[in-house]
Amino acid sequence: MSFELNRKLAAKRDPLPTTASIDSVTADIIRGAFETVCFESATFLGRAASSPIINSSNERNAAIVDAHGRLAMGAVGTPHLTFVNQMETRWGLMNQERYDWGPGDVFVGNDPDHGGGHLPDYCVYGPVYDDKGELICIQTLQAHQGDTGGKDAGGFSLDAVDIFTEG
């Protein structure tokens, strides 16, 4: 990843609002709903996966990122994947118009040059819109896949000359 792109993806986002127009009970209900969505998404991914890396070692995570690329909620799982989710999603947000995001879209990424951690960590994310078509948040799932193809089994090749031979 270029230094410039890395700087943009990791840059601090605008501060969160310091005032709220909703009461604390409603805010806690929303927080609980976000937490449940993340927990159930990560749990379902673990149950549905055939890879022991995902279903036994739990190298997976789910998160919700707001429309500005800020982490809104993360599930219990592998902590570093929560932050890689954010980076991949931020890259998607930077290129949103290029890919014509819309309701029902789902994106998959694993490229370290575009926000990913390393090739075996796949990020699947989809935008969530309100009834007016405004982007509210992005639901993300990330998991480590044992083999991504490439020159050597396992996705790690010491003599890889490019991303394609690495896998």
Where are these predicted regions, by residue range?
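Mobile "lid/hinge" segments at catalytic clefts and subdomain interfaces of large enzymes
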Residues: 134-167
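GAF sensory domains
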Residues: 108-111, 119-125
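Regulatory sensory and allosteric helical modules in signal-transduction proteins
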Residues: 67-74, 86-111
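Short solvent-exposed loop/turn micro-motifs enriched in small/polar/acidic residues
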Residues: 55-57, 99-100, 119-121, 163
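A short, hydrophobic, proline-anchored segment that marks a local hinge/packing element in signaling
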Residues: 121-131, 140
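A short, polar/charged loop-to-alpha-helix boundary motif
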Residues: 80-91, 146-155
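Long, charge-dense accessory insertions within large macromolecular proteins
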Residues: 2-86
